[in-house]
Amino acid sequence: VTASSEDMKHSSDCYYDEYNLMDLRILSGVGFTDEDIDAIRNTEGVEGLFATHTIDAVTKIDGTQSTVRVMTVPDDNLTDDNKDYINRLRIKEGRLPEKEGECVIRYSEFYQEKIEIGDVITLSSGNDSDISDSLKTDEYEVVGIVYTPYYVSYDIGQSDVGNGSVGFCIMVTDSSFAREYYTEVFATVEGAKELDTYSDEYFDLVGETKERIEDAAEERLDARVQSVKDDIESERRKTIDEIYENVRTEVR
């Protein structure tokens, strides 16, 4: 049993390395700007970095509402030589999306019977917001079926839209998103691939880089908060100026 367990760990470690699985996933409640991304990229220990957009939406499959997680594929250089192509996809059937309005679906035995290449998935926000606030189009043609190392089990996770549980996952081009800020960042750590993913040495190495990123994030957070305050103040002044202008117009 012990030998079998070690073999499974070794196989999964090789799989993670082959498909460049992230070592760190970085989240922010206010999103990430290009300046934030540069700060993370320049942090000691960071090897590869992929800034991405992610949202949860709802759709109907065979008349039943389902929650779908929408993630992104890099727009270019999807090669094994690109260290920034993290969580690489393996194509089971079809091809990767090349333009807005195309997507691939993560392989799932359950949904594979319901969604096929050529089908069109129509998305809505599942709440009071408009899906166009996040995506440039609400319809996506399935052009491929893929495996991803990002999800190694059938459970994708929970969501605050739909029924609360994510049913399946699609990937679209990064340019399909309308949002200005990135929602999450994946990073790999220098020297991590040479270590066993399950070893203390691996966790120590990744932990050191994680702490340095957190320090850099604190500095960037202060700058972001000030930027948001400045934007709010600018809008406030603009509104006041418009009110005064309207008052003057009425007096005339």
Predicted region positions:
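A hydrophobic alpha-helix feature that marks transmembrane segments and, especially
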Residues: 2-3
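Basic-flanked hydrophobic alpha-helices used for secretion and membrane insertion
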Residues: 6-252
